Amino acid sequence: MKKVRVITAEEAALMVNDGDTISTGGFVSCACPEALSIALENRFLETGHPRDLTLFFAAGQGHRDGTGGDHYGHEGMVKRVVGGHWDRAPKLGDLALANKIEAYNLPQGVITHMYRDIAAHNIGTITHVGLYTFADPRNGGGKLNECTKEDLVKLVNIEGEERLLYKGFPINVCFLRGSYADEYGNCTVHREIGPLDVTAQAQATKNSGGKVIVQVEKIVQGGSLDPKLVKIPGIYVDAIVVGSVEDNMQCLGMPYDGALTGEFRIPVDAIPPIPLDAKKIIARRAAMELPQDAIVNLGTGAPEKIANVAAEEGISDKMTLTVEAGGIAGVPYGGTQFGASANAMAILDHNVQFDFYQGGGLDVAFLGLAETAPNGDLNVSKFGTDRKSVV
C-alpha cells in the first residue's frame, strides 16, 4: 500500500468544489469532523466558495450552537440538504423554512442503508420504511418546503406489496472522524462512541469516484494498528487531517470517557442522577412500562432520561436498552453524549442496528414527539417557530 496524504484542514477544504455532494459523519454531538467542517465554513465565508453544495447526512450533527451541520448553514453555501434529523442544526432549519434551500427529511435508518446501496451501485434503497408517513410520495416524499421539487422517493409495487424506492446519488466528498490512522490511511474508531456509518460512507464515496477525508487524533506507524479495529481501510482514504484536541473531542465539549467505548466499565451508581423536572416525571412514568427482559429502543428528548431512571432504580440489567447509534445494553447517555452507552455489551454499526430495528427486532420503543392528537396520530417531524427546526 502507498502512504496516505497528510494535509491540513484548510487544504482539505480546497478539495471541495462548487456543486459537490458532501456527506458528513457524526451522531448528534459525537464523532463530528469539526476541524474539516470549520475549515470549509471559513473558506466559504472568506471566498464565497464552495457554493451550491448538497449536504447528505443520517443522524443530526451538532449541538444547536453553530457546530456540526450548522457550519453549512449559510445562504449560498448549500443548495440542497438531505438529512435524517435536522434538529441539531437550526441554521439549516432556518434556511429550509425560509425556502432558501431545497430540503428533504428522509428516515434516518433509510439513509444509513442508502450509503450501502450507493456503494454497491444499486438503483436505490427499497424498503417498507416510510410507507404512509410524510416520507411517502403520496404525502410529500420527505420534501420540507415549496422550493423542493425533485422526487427522491418513489412508490413501487414488488410481488404485490407496496414499497418505497429511495433514489441513490453519487457522493463527491465525505468528511469522517476516526481515532488513529496509520501511515497508509487505515483508520480506527476505537476512541469514538461507535463506528457509526464510517465504513459505508467511505465505500459509497470511493465507489462514486469521490474523495474520502478523515480527521483523526494522531498518526501511527504503518501496519501497527489492530486490523480488527480498522473500520476505514486505507484503500478508501484520499487524505488524513490531524485535528486539535478541541476538534477531536469524543462528544462536543466533552473529554474522552472510556466507559463509552468499552475500554472499562463503571459502577452504575457512579452515574449522576438527573434533576427532578417535568421530563424526568414523564420518564419515570414511562419506565413503569419497561417489560422485564425486553429489547428496548430509547429515542432522543424525554425518552433518553428513561435510561437514567432505570440506572437510579437499579433495574438497568433487567432489560436490554439500545440506541440507534449502535449500543447494545448498558446505560444509554443523553444530552451532549446522546448516542453513547456506558457499559455496553456490544457496539454495532449504525446501519446494522437499523437492520434489526426495521425488521421488528424490538419489543418496545420509547420515542419523543412534538404533538399528538386524541386519536393517537403523532407529529414527530416539525416543531413550532419557537424551535425553528426541522427534525
Regions found by a protein language model. Give the residues of each.
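Conserved alpha/beta enzyme-core scaffold
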Residues: 1-391
